Amino acid sequence: MLMQDSNSFSTVTPQVARFDTPLHLKSGAVLDSYELVYETYGELNAARSNAVLVCHALSGNHHLAGLYDDNPKSAGWWNNMIGPGKSIDTQKFFLIGVNNLGGCHGSTGPASIDVRTGKCYGPNFPVVTVEDWVQTQVRLADYLGIDQFAAVAGGSLGGMQALQWTLDFPERVRHALVIAAAAKLTAQNIAFNDVARQAIITDPDFHGGDYYSHGVIPRRGLRLARMLGHITYLSDDSMAAKFGRELRNGALAFGYDVEFEIESYLRYQGDKFASQFDANTYLLMTKALDYFDPAFPHNNDLSAAFRFARANFLVLSFTTDWRFSPERSRAIVRALLDNELNVSYAEITSSHGHDSFLMEDRHYHRLVRAYMDNVVV
């Protein structure tokens, strides 16, 4: 739980919930037991009506805000959005962040020990879907004694989870914040994910996903996957403004080492990611993205998919997000309106591309604050 005063956070401590009831996954696989790492922020009120679940994106985790005692630079990934007096105010709401099943930040995943073998699951960890994650999040809510969330929120893949909540458990969520998301990936996005996976799988150190027993990690492949992904998260405008065609050493080297500043930046980001993230988890997360398509069981009719949804919605997109473009958000809005649901929508001018949902933008944060201020607890 996160300790806080009236002005700022102090420190946060992750917690672990263990579940021994078998989990039946969409793939048909079964996990006999599993653990979820989570963090909480603020105080749950007496009516237990002020809980907000925040779902993370591909490379995110349970650490939404605040710091860890042993790392003064460990601010959570949505620290600019969550906190006392911030857009999602922890003086009003009780927030929960959870590392999704299959993750690599403490929840059961490929790097965890399979008690049946005494070894890491590795490639034997089952493929998981957004629907599976929502099932585990419901169990966590039950574990915490929360019957209904005031809101479920998330950006990108996190926004997809918020959508799935309104479909699978409409009676358990009053508001959904769907930010920089889509109701399904385009063929182009699936292609990006496959190239990233192939970079990992073809790394000689991948060893069919069992690199743990070889004492190595597929660093080169994971690095390339992150470099590719990072390009798609940025906009051309933001890359031009930040890097342009600047040369690292001021002159052409006429070789194949790093010359341009953008090359240096991408390699740094790739190396950093490869040292912090598990390759098998990356494969799982991208597959969950690929498989998300709530309209598919309804003859590709997204409006029909939302037939039983009850929540109120805030849907936000960003002008330069070409990975999950504003048109993808507008398609969600149209489907919600077809079902006469309450929807607030805004397309926010931003130069930061898909990563805009993580940025501290005054207009964006004011929109979220205005919406959350009207959420009754």
Swiss-Prot record:
Pathway: Amino-acid biosynthesis; L-methionine biosynthesis via de novo pathway; O-succinyl-L-homoserine from L-homoserine: step 1/1
Keywords from the named record: Acyltransferase, Amino-acid biosynthesis, Cytoplasm, Methionine biosynthesis, Transferase
SUPFAM superfamilies tied to this protein: alpha/beta-Hydrolases
An example Gene Ontology CC term for this record: cytoplasm
Active site per database record: S156, D321, H354
Site (Important for acyl-CoA specificity): R323
Binding site residues for substrate: R226, D355
Key word Lipid metabolism present: no
UniProt keyword Thylakoid present: no
Enzyme class (EC, first level): transferase
Reactions performed catalytically: L-homoserine + succinyl-CoA = O-succinyl-L-homoserine + CoA
Function recorded in the entry: Transfers a succinyl group from succinyl-CoA to L-homoserine, forming succinyl-L-homoserine.
Similarity comment text for this entry: Belongs to the AB hydrolase superfamily. MetX family.
UniProt xrefs under HAMAP family: MetX_acyltransf
Protein name according to UniProt: Homoserine O-succinyltransferase
